[in-house]
Amino acid sequence: MKKFLMLATASSLAFYMTACSDNSTSADDDPLKPASVYVFGADSKSGELRWVNEDGISDKSLQFHKDSRIIGIDGNLFVLERFGADNLALVDASENEVSWQVDFEDGENPSDVVKANKDEVWVALEGAAKIVKVAVKDGKITKTVKTNKFNQGEATTPNLVDLDVSGDTLFALFQRSESYAFKVPGLLAMYKLSNGELLDTIKLAKKNPTAMGFADGKLYVASLGEYNETYGTDADDARGIEVVDFAKKKSSMVVDGKKLGGGVYAFAVDPDGVAYAAVYKTWGDVPLAKVNLSEKSVKTVSDVSDVSGSLVFDDVDGVLYIGDRGSKGGLYKYDGKKATKIDAPKDALPVYGIALVR
């Protein structure tokens, strides 16, 4: 079998380790500015984009596909229209209007976007075996990096679900499912941010990873694990939060599903060493866990009940934005002690995604 892993040398490993920064969504070192908060709402039929103003969530909205993800980069807001639409749109945050929208092939399912440089972004495609670089000015694809070598078995895609950036390195998180089953642990791949050249890969400790983030110079990865017979997740050691050791090229558990109460559906990291995890027990039962990564301790935030509507941490204000889709659903702002609900119009759809634009 042809060897497909391009192993980085010891010197290059050391380089991208020392290049790590807490601001994992930016490719430069500009100081963080106060952010504008956007919220995406969705039900079974439609989706809408709103924004937070002085009075709460806006009355005005922009319509998008119901399964969309929103991400802010350099004053712009990217809308990733996913299953059933497969589009990428750029919203001008100064006007709250769509600047352009481009189509991907059916089923390519854009899953994440990060800054490549001041003129381009990298876009993850969960439903296709590739990462694409896209021009910010018009949405045109400028480069394609194939990832089919990471496909599991007969699968046609390695299921790229999350991207992150540290220094000049692009990190890609692959679930590697096959026929809707997770037979092997997830995979972390490192690329040159500038041109997508593969540097190295590391096999993760657990199956079905969902998200990653940097804290105290370390990369943490959250995993949902395999589903049980009722399509929930078990409180066992087959899932949880792990930390990557780049020097040893391995990943080990920090806290598992026993402590958390289940697998991690969504994940946000305070760069100072606290992780917030949406613990998916079963449909509608998704509590918020606050994890001290150094102490490996877990506490449950009691003010919310179903945080499947997204988690985003604001590095500047030191607060966590929470999308709760439970009985007291809405957009919440958590200061580390208390979660406060932000006022919203009565016709606003349940929160499905949150983004910060600065």
For the regions a protein language model found, what residue spans apply to each?
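Conserved beta-propeller blade signature
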Residues: 36-40, 76-80, 120-123, 170-172, ...
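Short, conserved, GDST-rich strand-edge loop motifs in beta-rich repeat architectures
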Residues: 32, 173-185, 222-238
